[in-house]
């Protein structure tokens, strides 16, 4: 069996690639990073290092690379016969690979390949695969859309594994935490007979996606923004500070109240899940930089993102969101010279009225009360 995977970066190699290889797949990695693609083609294998005592290694083989910038036709050829397509490239890049996937689907139709195929976007976003489907369908004619409706699935997925910023002499070596979770919405699959070991298949993915995004992503960002405000440079340093740890624990408590109100989770189950997350952030073998975890603050302030969405939903239910709101105030002070969004946000705050900036970044144009609360939080964080 073969898989075409878009994104040969650390998550692609260190999580999705590892899982696919462990399930017996050969992998065609697709990327524009020529250093990585060339190394994959020269060696056909790479190592993953687990961030645990002894730094256990996992060996991955039967892999190659395709530079989609130079050889888009090879990507189309690979999709024509592949058994699975996955992505780990970042939500904003999905639209750029959509034409290639569309051409691959057309090639399958032209070759009369009626083997069902699932395309799984493994991204930090809600509804990633369905978003990719919309982008792909915008490049399809009606007859190919009809073919895709019958044979091509776009099941949403939730993925979770911390892969810190890292540098190695070997461009293919990647260090990852031991914990990993990959959940796929089986109700959206076209090829449900192809199930991967260590991947969890659920009839409804939304509870798992929200649990992950509002716990891991919100929690990680909370440590970053609180730590930055206190002058720390790494997550590991920051979380040793009792103020940061308390902020994280109180945030997760607010998130628990929302998840319990919305979904069929058990309180003890969520408490254990959140304790595990705190332990992951405290892992001394993963040194993640606050600059990386906190980057793109404008995106992270989005209406459906990791802070504003849970705040909106907690407010609608009359539940507390005090700690989440405190962190939101700190995000507006995240001044990271190397991050373009951070610098754009600081310029907006200098040039525009604070409440206008809040509406622009959060999309809260219909909730003046919440905008006022955020403005107060921003001022309190001065």
From Swiss-Prot:
Keyword terms of this UniProt record: NAD, Oxidoreductase
Family matches, as SUPFAM superfamilies: 6-phosphogluconate dehydrogenase C-terminal domain-like, NAD(P)-binding Rossmann-fold domains
Enzyme Commission identifier(s): 1.1.1.17
Residues that hold NAD(+) according to the record: 3-14
Entry GO CC: cytosol
Coiled coil: none
Biological processes annotated in GO: mannitol catabolic process
Record bears the keyword Oxidoreductase: yes
Top-level taxon of the source organism: Bacteria
Catalysed reactions, as listed in the record: D-mannitol 1-phosphate + NAD(+) = beta-D-fructose 6-phosphate + NADH + H(+)
Pfam family for this entry, one: Mannitol_dh
GO MF annotations, alphabetized: mannitol-1-phosphate 5-dehydrogenase activity
Family indicated by similarity: Belongs to the mannitol dehydrogenase family.
Protein name (database record): Mannitol-1-phosphate 5-dehydrogenase
Species for this entry: Ligilactobacillus salivarius (strain UCC118) (Lactobacillus salivarius)
